[in-house]
Amino acid sequence: MLVLTRKLKEVIQIGDDIEITVLAIQGDQVKLGINAPKHVEIHRKEIYLAIQAENNAASLASKTSLEQLNEQLKHWKGGKQA
C-alpha cells in the first residue's frame, strides 16, 4: 500500500485521468474531490460491498429461477408427449 501525506488543496494524481484533491479537513474527517472519466466507477467501500452483495444475490436468484423454469419445462414436455 502506498501511503501519502497531503495538505488542504493538494492533489494526488493516479495515472493520466484521475485526480484526488483534499477539499477539507474537519476533526477526523477528510473531504476528497475526485476527478475521473465517466467510465470509471467510484464508490465508497461500504457502497461497493453492498453492490457486490446485491449482484451476487441476484445472480443466485436468477440461477435458481432458471433451474425451476427448466424443471417446469421438462414436466410440461413430458405431459404433452404422454
Swiss-Prot record:
Q: Which InterPro entries match?
A: CsrA (IPR003751), CsrA_sf (IPR036107)
Please state the protein's primary subcellular location. cytoplasm
Q: Where in the cell is it found?
A: Cytoplasm
The record's Gene Ontology cellular component field reads: cytosol
Example GO molecular function: mRNA 5'-UTR binding
Its Gene Ontology biological processes? Answer: bacterial-type flagellum organization; mRNA catabolic process; negative regulation of translational initiation; regulation of bacterial-type flagellum assembly; regulation of carbohydrate metabolic process
- Gene3D superfamilies referenced in this protein's UniProt entry, alphabetically: Translational regulator CsrA (2.60.40.4380)
Alphabetized UniProt keyword annotations: Bacterial flagellum biogenesis, Cytoplasm, Repressor, RNA-binding, Translation regulation
Q: How does it assemble?
A: Homodimer; the beta-strands of each monomer intercalate to form a hydrophobic core, while the alpha-helices form wings that extend away from the core.
Q: Mind telling me which NCBIfam families this protein's record contains?
A: csrA, PRK01712.1
Annotated PANTHER family: CARBON STORAGE REGULATOR
| HAMAP family noted in UniProt | CsrA
Q: Which family does the record claim for this protein? A: Belongs to the CsrA/RsmA family.
Any idea what job this protein has?
A translational regulator that binds mRNA to regulate translation initiation and/or mRNA stability. Usually binds in the 5'-UTR at or near the Shine-Dalgarno sequence preventing ribosome-binding, thus repressing translation. Its main target seems to be the major flagellin gene, while its function is anatagonized by FliW.
Q: List the protein's name.
A: Translational regulator CsrA
What species is given as this protein's source?
A: Geobacillus sp. (strain WCH70)
